[in-house]
Amino acid sequence: MRTSQYLLATQKETPADAVVISHQLMLRAGMIRKLASGLYTWLPMGLRVMRKVEAVVREEMNAAGALEVLMPSIQPAELWQESGRWEQYGPELLRLKDRHQRDFCVGPTHEEVITDLARNELSSYKQLPLNMYQIQTKFRDEIRPRFGLMRGREFIMKDAYSFHADQASLQETYDRMHQAYSNVFTRLGLDFRPVQADTGSIGGSYSHEFHVLAESGEDDVIFSDSSDYAANIEKAEAIPRETVRPAPTEELRLVDTPDAKTIAQLVENHGLAIEKTVKTLIVRGAEEGKLVALVVRGDHELNEIKAAKLEQVADPLIMATDAELREAIGAGAGSLGPLNLPLEVVIDRSVALMSDFGIGANIDDKHYFGVNWERDLPVPQVADLRNVVEGDPSPDGQGTLVIKRGIEVGHIFQLGTKYSEALKCQVLGENGKPVVLSMGCYGIGVSRVVAAAIEQSYDDKGIIWNDALAPFQIALVPLRYETDVVREATDKLYAELTAAGFEVLLDDRDKKTSPGIKFADMELIGIPHRIVVSDRGLADGNLEYKHRTEQDAQALPLNEVLTFLQARVRR
């Protein structure tokens, strides 16, 4: 491809509303353009990259036995009402009416549609297992679209759905898809981690997320430094570093603390070590009108997903209001503690191993210091309530936990029978009796992968693409292309490289565009291999080669260029 025949839409300045590096560089490199909040047009340069992601995804899905389909993006409300999600989904579900006043939505996901297809097409266990996928535009009406493609409203997604007569078959396909996802991200050259995850609003019983590691990531990715254990922050089990509760050394005492409304003030003004403090958080119970106290160490954070899974706690988690606290306890949030508390109490594992610690006295501006379990108050229910922190023991007993930032680019679920029961999707089993189908679902954010790859690989000059993702593998940059000798050599090399199967962008802009601008544009776009043709080099029988990640260029004999690139460029 020649730049004279291409939309080379690079920009020197960074748009003011672009915050994250992928958004900045995709705009500057001429990959995308903003149409409206959370909506982007893919320009030719960006679309070439996304098509490469799609191709790898499609190859691995096909190799895993999945069949490609294409479902409508507009879905009838009846299906969502049948599954119960029409009422459950919030305003991120874009709802509309047609001219006949029938309700529809723009699909954020396709569980209902695929289950409707399966119940109409499948009748016997002999047709199973069946795994179908699509690469389709999705829409979620995010309240605050931001970060470019990282959190837009419209996006491209690969979503697959599998149907099974039993759990063993589902597990087999789930494992195959897990491997297929690992293959996809490995082939794309990404540093990623698959992690155990909570099933969230999709539902189901078992899931894994796939995260591209990047400092700009929104999610914490937890993994062991000595094993393959990995989980997201919602799912990671918190194991206390302590194994035995120390014996008491202090007496219980009631202390005036008008200057300690927070843990930080308690530590600063009263000399307590933060690991000797606790936070008592009051939440609404599963039973109407009931409150429950959750207690974590002062330096730990409550994990709301874990807490909401307690049978006595309302799901989703709802914190008690100040009025509810006053009515039930008679004190404000900064003075609460588990001693003499007229509520059911659940404490974190780490709290159960504390001694000589400080708690709120359930009286405004007062705390108890020197508190000890069993001596001063009984040990209540103990549960895993907190987020893990770096250095915690790995739950599998091997090594300690490391925390990195990650960008979620894939998610796989074992849905079980959640949707098939709701939509009555069943077949005749081997014994001739109806069997409700078990389902799996498997998503990859195709457009998000492009942005995540940039977040993982860039420098102050621009994007650094690997060979698998680059829009073009080779940038061919002639200096003084208007001269016969340079033009003839360049055109001949361009023909040879394209005939050999390389993806080449020939920068044939005229002499009004300086070599410096040409080099800067190619580095901004991130093309991994650059060949410079100049009259001076040709006089010596050489071209100039430079890889995007290298500082210095090297001379390359003209008659060795093809062999060199065939060995260097990964295809």
UniProtKB/Swiss-Prot annotation:
Compartments it resides in: Cytoplasm
Free-text comment about domains: Consists of three domains: the N-terminal catalytic domain, the editing domain and the C-terminal anticodon-binding domain.
Subunit and partners: Homodimer.
Protein name: Proline--tRNA ligase
Pfam families in the cross-refs: HGTP_anticodon, tRNA-synt_2b, tRNA_edit
NCBIfam families in UniProt: PRK09194.1, proS_fam_II
General function of this protein: Catalyzes the attachment of proline to tRNA(Pro) in a two-step reaction: proline is first activated by ATP to form Pro-AMP and then transferred to the acceptor end of tRNA(Pro). As ProRS can inadvertently accommodate and process non-cognate amino acids such as alanine and cysteine, to avoid such errors it has two additional distinct editing activities against alanine. One activity is designated as 'pretransfer' editing and involves the tRNA(Pro)-independent hydrolysis of activated Ala-AMP.
